Amino acid sequence: MSAISSVFSSDKSVFIPYISLGDPDYESCISWADALIRGGAGILELGIPFSDPVADGPVIQKAFKRALAYPFSMKKILEITAEIHKLHPETPLVYLTYFNPLYSMGLEAFTESAKNSGIQGLIIPDLPFDTSEAEEFFSQLERKKIDFIHLVTPATTIDRIQSMKSFASGFIYYVTSYGVTGERRALAVGLKERIQMVRNKVGLPVCAGFGISTADQAKEISTYANGVIIGSAVQKIIEESGSNREVCISKLFTYASEIRASMK
């Protein structure tokens, strides 16, 4: 059983927050991660900055822009990841990254370095699972015992969901709405049934993300999803308070605690 799989061994839904590494600087991200994990995160997503984040909304796009205002360093990304892992070795860390930064480094070198830094899962929004590149990469990840986490959207066909079973591990990231990341006022109609269907077809835990921001939304989704993923709302706190580290730490801890307390 992988470290990620073990998190889902209880009946309680898992809180999975996301932060963009490098915003406003690399060192602060260690504090952000620590606050979120102490507040109740069961898994932590770490975003690798990229100049063309096609799946991300304005909040995360701005976070990447702030991070990339400084020279981008994959070496620094890996070092900060290792520091977070050292603080909380019990909490699985997952990279959410576009394919280009990995390809630029070299897939084998990246996989080895990510594993050594404490990464237990990867989400790559712009790498379809049914490509030769994905199949080759999946084999590398399997050897390193890193989970390859795939996205399912409202538009993904049932046939494609079934095909995903052979190339996915850890959990499925279910995108709750069309469009890019960002906060939404209401949840999609039929979300519960769709998540249950995906879980039955793939045989993995299903975590819901995109558009979730409030404790009430997290409470509702946690009754039928194995995990609740929140990115833009977390990153918004960092955008507004990141210049004052202690204030931001307090706000992130409070927010995480409220979300975790609301979940079933």
From Swiss-Prot:
EC number(s) stated in the UniProt entry for this protein: 4.2.1.20
Active site: 45 (proton acceptor), 56 (proton acceptor)
Enzyme class: lyase
Keywords: Amino-acid biosynthesis, Aromatic amino acid biosynthesis, Lyase, Tryptophan biosynthesis
Sample GO molecular function, one term: tryptophan synthase activity
Pathway: Amino-acid biosynthesis; L-tryptophan biosynthesis; L-tryptophan from chorismate: step 5/5
Reaction(s) catalysed (UniProt annotation): (1S,2R)-1-C-(indol-3-yl)glycerol 3-phosphate + L-serine = D-glyceraldehyde 3-phosphate + L-tryptophan + H2O
PROSITE patterns, A to Z: TRP_SYNTHASE_ALPHA (PS00167)
The UniProt record lists the keyword Amino-acid biosynthesis: yes
Entry GO terms, CC: cytosol
Presence of keyword NAD: no
Subunit structure: Tetramer of two alpha and two beta chains.
HAMAP family found in the cross-reference section: Trp_synth_alpha
Family: Belongs to the TrpA family.
Cited function: The alpha subunit is responsible for the aldol cleavage of indoleglycerol phosphate to indole and glyceraldehyde 3-phosphate.
Protein name: Tryptophan synthase alpha chain
Organism: Leptospira borgpetersenii serovar Hardjo-bovis (strain JB197)
